[in-house]
Design a protein with these regions (language model features):
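His/Asp/Glu-rich metal-coordinating catalytic cores
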Residues: 2-30, 39-146
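Short beta-strand-to-coil loop within P-loop NTPase ATPase cores
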Residues: 36
Length: 146
């Protein structure tokens, strides 16, 4: 099994996946490829080359930043697996806002989950948070963490 730090690790631009050559919710500057957890501005920014996200998140980003917020977009439904440079990525509901997603990254037998913002309490405005089974590493958003 791959060491977790070889699949995802923090950089000044955000959480980076070297084998897939993409960022999760990049925090500084534009990147060539981004996977976005949800449409709030602390996670979703314009100017990236390629953006992969849930269709509702892409719609929120377009409303906020204009239709040209990225050079290319790819909408992915919950549970739909996409391969990026040999790394499997799929989204699971995060229960935070419409389109909010946990980002699941799998490579060489390792499954890591990045939650983005999430909410476990039921909310009628979005699909409920779903735990991702058989997760090896769980990276939780902690807005008010210590």
């Amino acid at each position: 099994m791959l060491r977790p730090d070889l699949l995802l690790h923090p950089t000044p631009k955000g959480l980076y996946c070297p084998p897939g050559d993409f960022y999760l919710d990049p925090v500084r500057g534009a990147v060539d490829r981004a996977v976005i957890s949800h449409g709030h501005s602390d996670h979703a920014r314009g100017g990236h080359g390629k953006v992969l996200a849930h269709p509702h998140t892409l719609s929120i980003m377009a409303a906020r930043y204009g239709d040209s917020f990225a050079k290319q977009t790819q909408a992915v439904e919950y549970g739909e697996a996409i391969e990026i440079n040999g790394v499997t990525v799929w989204l699971s509901p995060a229960g935070h806002i419409l389109g909010s997603s946990q980002i699941v990254v799998e490579h060489k037998g390792l499954r890591m989950v990045f939650t983005g913002d999430y909410k476990r309490r039921w909310d009628p405005t979005c699909p409920q948070f779903e735990p991702v089974e058989n997760t090896h590493v769980f990276i939780s958003e902690a807005t008010f963490g210590l």
